[in-house]
């Protein structure tokens, strides 16, 4: 029997073994692929999204005199957001909540139908990473050349390639940061100020900050963002079912895999692949994968659904005269059916899961459209003066002071009527408006602004049957007939 000290020594890891809490990072070197359906779809998606990103701020939309004419604008100093004919005020931020709900449910709906198509084709991380890798390939070569270049000692040739890549990355990053700030001020003004040195240091700082994100995340972090930083990859599989379209490997057809011995000269494909699977273990599916995984190991968290492995495998199958689809973008139900020799089944688009997602999206969208169509064109806010709360006047009268704010949300001047209710024989006087002892008063508010008015409400002491009574103020828009009411207190001495 060994002694305790001997057992402890025997259980210790070797002294040269590295112990780590984290997985080692193996840099992915994606192979360049310029052919195939999904590769072309990725290029098309990138072109559309980047064109919209850089060109959308230059679109114009006439909103009238004195209003910004940029179609898409988030005016932070003016506390307003514009999207073509839609204008959102700060108190209407609930529209943003509705849009976020629709976006989330839309992502769930698309995931249930098409898998991680968002990650593979439309996510900004994927789009930018594709662009940065493309630049890297232009300077450093394709996969094998880049691997060899990283292993080579530093030389003028290596330095030149790396420097050219870095300069291009920095210029692209600055272009991305520049595009971002165009959404927050007039595009032509921002462009002029940035390129003539007249912009504020804060604006230059925002451009640099927003340039640093794609430079670091798309240039260096790349697949690490998708695997470790993005929360969507952690729960996306919960939205899949057997009818969701995912990238998968037909193991029943590809196994046993193995490299071809002796080539195919003089033999038919049936003779070459007799007694073995169609997979020739060329590892092209691994080499073109932006995250560096092997799809033959099954569906994985790191698979972003870009389907480049499908294009690569189809090209190999064409070369060897075998049917396409060894790696396919299909549902697991269809794949299981084919493995049993059943006829090709159609993907079920309408399922309880997709129906629920689409129904909730429709309900939220309907509520948003209704609230927008019936949105208020003005708002009312009333504040009671606190010092003093009330004043006792001669003739047994009580006076309370109020500040009212009328928000006119249209471009033209608004004409409003203010009326009192709830306190018998109450009258008012508005500072800056001629007349006293009025039951009603007309107030004008310039377009797209807040009108602030100070008024004094006076009532006989006999009208108060309590220390505090409810006073209702009603504002009527004389142009539209719509009303807004606010109930406050009318204070007095103890009765």
Indicate where each model-derived feature is located:
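Short aromatic-acidic-glycine turn motif
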Residues: 391, 422-435, 480-481
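Short acidic, flexible loop segments centered on an aromatic residue
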Residues: 412-426
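Long, low-complexity ectodomains and other extracytoplasmic segments of secretory-pathway proteins
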Residues: 346, 367-369, 375-394, 398-399, ...
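Membrane-embedded alpha-helical bundles of multi-pass integral membrane proteins
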Residues: 2-257, 310, 323, 327-361
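Short, solvent-exposed loop/turn segments enriched in Ser/Thr/Gly
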Residues: 397-403, 451-453, 466-471
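Terminal connector regions
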Residues: 458-495
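Intrinsically disordered, low-complexity Pro/Gly/Ser/Thr-rich segments with frequent PxxP/GP/PP motifs
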Residues: 432-461
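Cysteine-centered iron-sulfur cluster-binding motifs in ferredoxin-type domains/subunits
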Residues: 111-126, 218-233, 270-317
């Amino acid at each position: 029997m060994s002694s305790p000290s001997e057992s402890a020594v025997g259980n210790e890891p070797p002294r040269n073994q590295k112990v780590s809490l984290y997985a080692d990072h193996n840099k992915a070197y994606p192979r360049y692929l310029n052919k195939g359906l999904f590769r072309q779809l990725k290029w098309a998606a990138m072109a559309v999204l980047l064109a919209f990103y850089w060109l959308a701020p230059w679109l114009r939309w006439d909103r009238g005199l004195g209003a910004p004419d940029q179609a898409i604008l988030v005016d932070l100093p003016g506390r307003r957001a514009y999207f073509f004919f839609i204008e959102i005020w700060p108190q209407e931020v609930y529209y943003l909540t509705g849009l976020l709900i629709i976006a989330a449910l839309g992502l769930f709906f698309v995931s249930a139908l098409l898998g991680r198509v968002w990650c593979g084709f439309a996510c900004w991380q994927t789009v930018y990473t594709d662009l940065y890798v493309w630049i890297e390939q232009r300077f450093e070569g394709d996969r094998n050349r880049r691997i060899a270049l990283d292993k080579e000692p530093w030389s003028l040739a290596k330095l030149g390639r790396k420097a050219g890549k870095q300069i291009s990355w920095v210029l692209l990053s600055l272009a991305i940061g520049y595009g971002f700030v165009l959404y927050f001020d007039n595009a032509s003004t921002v462009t002029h100020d940035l390129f003539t040195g007249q912009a504020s240091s804060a604006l230059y700082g925002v451009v640099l900050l927003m340039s640093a994100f794609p430079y670091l995340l798309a240039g260096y972090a790349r697949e690490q963002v998708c695997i470790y930083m993005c929360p969507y990859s952690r729960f996306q599989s919960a939205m899949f079912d057997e009818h969701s379209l995912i990238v998968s490997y037909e193991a029943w057809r590809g196994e046993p895999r193995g490299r071809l011995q002796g080539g195919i000269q003089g033999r038919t494909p049936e003779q070459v692949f007799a007694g073995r699977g169609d997979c020739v273990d060329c590892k092209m599916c691994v080499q073109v994968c932006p995250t560096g995984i092997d799809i033959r190991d099954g569906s994985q968290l790191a698979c972003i659904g870009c389907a480049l492995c499908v294009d690569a495998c189809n090209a190999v199958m064409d070369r060897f005269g075998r049917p396409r689809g060894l790696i396919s973008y299909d549902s697991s139900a269809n794949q299981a059916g084919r493995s049993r020799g059943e006829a090709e089944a159609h993907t079920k688009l309408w399922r309880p899961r997709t129906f629920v997602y689409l129904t909730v999206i429709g309900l939220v969208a309907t509520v948003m459209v209704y609230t927008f169509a019936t949105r208020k064109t003005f708002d009312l806010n009333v504040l009671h003066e606190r010092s003093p709360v009330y004043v006792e006047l001669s003739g047994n009268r009580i006076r309370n002071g109020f500040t009212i704010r009328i928000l006119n949300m249209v471009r033209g001047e608004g004409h409003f009527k203010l009326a009192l209710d709830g306190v018998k024989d109450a009258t008012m006087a508005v500072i800056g408006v001629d007349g006293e002892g009025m039951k009603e008063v007309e107030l004008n508010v310039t377009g797209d602004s807040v009108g602030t008015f100070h008024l004094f409400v006076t009532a006989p002491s006999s009208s108060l049957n309590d220390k505090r009574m409810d006073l209702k103020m009603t504002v009527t828009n004389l142009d539209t007939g719509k009303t807004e009411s606010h109930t406050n207190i009318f204070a007095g001495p103890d009765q």
